[in-house]
Design a protein with these regions (language model features):
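Metal-dependent phosphohydrolase cores
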Residues: 1-100
Length: 100
């Protein structure tokens, strides 16, 4: 997933967490939800690692940790470790989508 869409996904997750539970929202809420449910999402290993990193930065530093310069650099670092495309062997309905 390109940097811009992966970053938009992170923003969408933070926004949803704030809007659906405004009274009990904490920065770690979004990170915890993602870790718990990410295995059910179709996403590449690189995207998973990037989103996880962004949400951890948000949890620890708030929006200050999600500056464009930092997120673009981290995305490039993560993207360099993985192939540009990944093929899922099948649509597994009863197993985790992200192995591990």
């Amino acid at each position: 997933m390109p940097w811009i869409y992966a970053t938009e996904y992170v923003c969408d997750m933070i926004s949803a967490s704030k809007n659906y539970n405004p009274k009990n929202f904490k920065p770690e809420t979004t990170y915890d939800y993602f870790i718990k449910h990410a295995k059910n999402y179709y996403m590449s290993q690189g995207t998973y690692e990037y989103v996880k990193w962004c949400l951890a930065r948000y949890r620890d530093l708030g929006f200050k940790g999600l500056k464009k310069k930092d997120t673009k650099a981290k995305y490039a670092e993560i993207a360099a470790k993985y192939p540009r495309t990944e093929m899922l062997t099948s649509m597994r309905l009863s197993e985790d989508l992200i192995p591990g």
